[in-house]
């Protein structure tokens, strides 16, 4: 009996010594709202988090995962985190009116305190300044962040990785500058200089070991989009995609990079334009994308677009116009309907307005409605612009209701939609007013 007892104790001791300790992330929310959607994103998983009655939840991570960055999402709030095996931590979030205070504790707290420090807040350079000033500000900000990193006494492996993250987080802003500089600087016909493209080419390198880092993926996608579409004067989604795929083929060798970028750009195209031209690049997708999860998501996306293909009925909407009158889609039946989904802060949207006004004038008294739906969160900005610039057509504000946008899977603006007299879809992603094909399409509409 004694021998059996000691043998059992010894066996349990051996098992306890060889069992890998669990790594957990504990989240605690203190405040008036604990019912926001809550998630933990890791490099390969998304954990949906349900808080208990005390506002607490625990996520146990799998054994033997690789150290990497993640993100805790609570409503619209984002908290970057670094996850390491055997280094559990707790994030307590105290919410008081408009103040949010995160507090990290536990063995894995140090790096997460660093990642959520004030130095990373509001560090984007001013988008209205000139290119030279903007690029100089980027470099200065990078130097500042790296100097701060080197005072933290982290191990060199993390420091090396974090320097890459800092670099790509800043240089992923370059495409944003090109899109928003004309709006903030109030300049027309802005074109990036050759130097700007040169800086981008040097800044973004082929680094497949970083393919799970979100900042790198953002910078890589932005680089490909800008470099491939360089000097492209007329926006055309299909031509742009062909240029992007050709650029990927000619400039990258890593299967991991090719797998990610081909899936990203073809999925983005289908997400915005639908499956009309799918046959032109389906073979490329099937041969270059090897990840089964990506392929499954892509097939699901294509199936969604089949539901808003030509001839399918559009979902109704009910929005207020500039005079406060309620307008429904069914109220507009009997005429063709050309819909512009836009916002005042969107530079490309504003760029289409003069072309849209020409269409409105050309087809005045014709059998077609021109409807503009603003998705501005600040309704006053929309009202001011509509009145000051005397915008025509039927001007509507979405009022926070995304049902119509979600039905048409609108992920970017401007987005144009063409419906027939019965409210059925002709084009779920119609050509823009600036595209000469739009007039050809209108002229071929029966009974316009």
Language model feature labels by segment:
Residues 1-26, 445-448:
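Bacterial Sec-dependent N-terminal signal peptides
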Residues 412-415, 421-448:
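Non-catalytic, surface beta->alpha helical segment in thiol-disulfide oxidoreductase systems
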């Amino acid at each position: 009996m004694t021998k059996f007892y000691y043998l059992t104790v010894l066996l349990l001791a051996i098992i306890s010594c060889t069992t890998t300790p669990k790594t957990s992330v504990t989240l605690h929310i203190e405040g008036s709202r604990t019912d926001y959607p809550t998630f933990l994103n890791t490099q390969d998983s998304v954990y949906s988090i349900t808080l208990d009655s005390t506002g607490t939840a625990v996520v146990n991570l799998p054994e033997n995962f690789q150290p990497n960055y993640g993100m805790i999402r609570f409503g619209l709030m984002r908290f970057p985190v670094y996850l390491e095996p055997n280094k559990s931590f707790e994030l307590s979030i105290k919410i008081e009116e408009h103040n949010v205070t995160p507090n990290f504790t536990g063995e894995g707290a140090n790096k997460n305190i660093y990642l959520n420090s004030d130095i990373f807040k509001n560090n984007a350079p001013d988008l209205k300044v000139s290119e030279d000033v903007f690029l100089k500000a980027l470099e200065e900000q990078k130097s500042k962040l790296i100097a701060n990193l080197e005072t933290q006494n982290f191990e060199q492996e993390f420091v090396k990785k974090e320097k890459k993250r800092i670099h790509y987080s800043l240089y992923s802003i370059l495409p944003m500058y090109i899109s928003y500089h004309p709006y903030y600087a109030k300049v027309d016909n802005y074109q990036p200089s050759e130097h700007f493209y040169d800086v981008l080419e040097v800044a973004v390198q082929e680094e497949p070991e970083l393919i799970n880092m979100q900042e790198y993926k953002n910078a890589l996608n932005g680089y490909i989009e800008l470099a491939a579409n360089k000097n492209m004067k007329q926006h055309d989604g299909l031509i742009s995609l062909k240029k992007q795929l050709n650029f990927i083929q000619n400039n990258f060798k890593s299967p991991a990079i090719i797998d990610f970028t081909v899936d990203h750009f073809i999925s983005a195209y289908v997400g915005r334009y639908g499956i009309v031209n799918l046959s032109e690049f389906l073979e490329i997708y099937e041969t270059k994308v090897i990840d089964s999860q990506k392929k499954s998501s892509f097939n699901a996306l294509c199936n969604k677009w089949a539901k808003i293909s030509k001839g399918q009925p559009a979902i109704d909407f009910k929005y207020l116009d500039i005079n406060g009158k309620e307008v429904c889609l069914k109220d507009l039946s009997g005429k063709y309907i050309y819909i512009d989904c836009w916002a005042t802060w969107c530079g490309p949207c504003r760029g289409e307005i003069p072309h849209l006004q020409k269409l409105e004038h050309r087809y005045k008294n014709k059998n077609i409605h021109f409807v503009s739906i603003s998705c501005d969160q600040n309704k006053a900005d929309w009202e001011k612009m509509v009145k000051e610039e005397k915008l025509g057509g039927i001007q509507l504000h979405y009022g926070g209701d995304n049902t119509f946008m979600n039905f048409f899977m609108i992920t970017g603006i401007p987005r144009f939609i063409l419906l027939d007299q019965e409210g059925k879809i002709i084009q779920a992603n119609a050509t823009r007013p600036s595209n000469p094909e739009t007039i050809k399409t209108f002229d071929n509409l029966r009974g316009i």
